[in-house]
């Protein structure tokens, strides 16, 4: 019985820790249909506007420069929130990424961004190097849009942590489920 209670406690703690995470929230604001989505390793072109969640103050915008930002996705050239939040995106798609400090700049001041800030980026995928731009952008209805990548990652993480917790519980039960008496002491 103690083993069961311990296992349930471990699973609950792990799940709460994962679900309480505010590292990355992805809202698809303009879902688009396409044959080819972004993947890690792609060089992509993105328009964006970055604001501080705390006060809505804009700290950067590629629209102001009239030039999209280009980088290799998943290569660590940008903050983790971008490397993960812009995967599986179609050309023409728009997303709002809400990025917690651990997926942003952490405890560092960076230009006008205070340490520990949660960032909000309105993003638009303008292009993927080597992938022709579609002649027209076909939007999806909100009901056709897939679940956000962040939600899928949370489910995946909870499953992973639950599996690890179950393995620990099995080990504990195996170690304490010894019915043989040890009178050596």
UniProtKB/Swiss-Prot annotation:
- What chemistry does it catalyse, as a reaction equation? [protein]-peptidylproline (omega=180) = [protein]-peptidylproline (omega=0)
Which subcellular locations apply to this protein? Endoplasmic reticulum
Q: Name one GO molecular function term.
A: peptidyl-prolyl cis-trans isomerase activity
One GO cellular component, as annotated: endoplasmic reticulum
Please provide the record's keywords in A-Z order: Endoplasmic reticulum, Isomerase, Rotamase, Signal
Entry superkingdom: Eukaryota
Q: What is its EC number?
A: 5.2.1.8
The main location class comes to: endoplasmic reticulum
Give a GO biological-process term: chaperone-mediated protein folding
Q: Does the keyword Signal apply?
A: yes
Q: How is its activity regulated?
A: Inhibited by both FK506 and rapamycin.
**Signal peptide annotation:** 1-20
Mind telling me which Gene3D superfamilies this protein's record contains? 3.10.50.40
Q: Where is this motif: Prevents secretion from ER?
A: 182-185
Is the keyword Isomerase assigned to this protein?
Answer: yes
Domain named PPIase FKBP-type is located at 41-129
Similarity comment text for this entry: Belongs to the FKBP-type PPIase family. FKBP2 subfamily.
Biological role: PPIases accelerate the folding of proteins. It catalyzes the cis-trans isomerization of proline imidic peptide bonds in oligopeptides.
What's the protein called, per UniProt?
FK506-binding protein 2
Q: What is the scientific name of the source organism? A: Podospora anserina
């Amino acid at each position: 019985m103690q083993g069961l209670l311990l296992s349930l406690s471990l699973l609950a703690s792990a799940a709460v820790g994962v679900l309480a995470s505010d590292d990355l929230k992805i809202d698809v604001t303009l879902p688009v249909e396409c044959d080819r989505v972004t993947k890690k390793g792609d060089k992509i072109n993105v328009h964006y506007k970055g604001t501080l969640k705390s006060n809505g103050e804009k700290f950067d915008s590629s629209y102001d420069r009239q030039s999209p930002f280009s980088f290799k996705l998943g290569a660590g050239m940008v903050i983790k929130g971008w490397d993960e939040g812009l995967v599986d995106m179609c050309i023409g798609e728009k997303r709002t990424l809400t990025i917690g400090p651990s997926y942003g700049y952490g405890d560092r001041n960076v230009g006008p961004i205070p340490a520990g800030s949660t960032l909000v980026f309105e993003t638009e995928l303008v292009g993927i190097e080597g992938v022709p731009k579609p002649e027209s952008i076909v939007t999806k209805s909100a009901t056709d849009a897939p679940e956000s990548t962040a939600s899928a990652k949370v489910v995946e993480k909870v499953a992973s942590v639950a599996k690890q917790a179950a393995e620990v519980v099995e080990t504990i039960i195996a170690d304490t489920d010894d019915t043989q008496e040890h009178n050596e002491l």
